[in-house]
């Protein structure tokens, strides 16, 4: 059976043994003679496999929520997985229903805010964050969500201000600091972005989280190289 037939079977049936059989055949053929059609076919095989894996992950997160309704983590993973499947509207619909059923629940505002963000509906994310903040004005999660919404709407200074406030309220969650680092780079404020990455490294090192420093160190090295290149061009 050739790679094209295996790819067609895997697309139609989603059976793992067809993926396992097709993958090395594609890799061998590409190594022998790189070809645009082979690369496209192999890419699509991997993409299809990724979608199937994500669908399994969705089922696991949904089951985890059933088993432990008070754990927030699987909710956020579920929202992210739906976005990865290009189905963010399904997460939005779910958490709109949940909030409607529990309009005084702060966590439901948080979930729905994140769902709107993954759907790139920044206006609604901003609205839901502000609505939740009427219940708890100093909720770090919703302030961070509001920051993400502002960033999506082009309000960089408002986003940075919200993320700084979120970090002040909850120093043990540095997600807002990562968001700041990326936004500052997009705004071409590379020195400030580098400072944010250094702060992330320092935060992890202070907690003996060595592995967690590897990625921010790579980001910092990349920024330093870009800054050095700019200096050399002057």
Each predicted region: which residue ranges?
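TPR alpha-solenoid repeat register
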Residues: 38-39, 74, 108, 142, ...
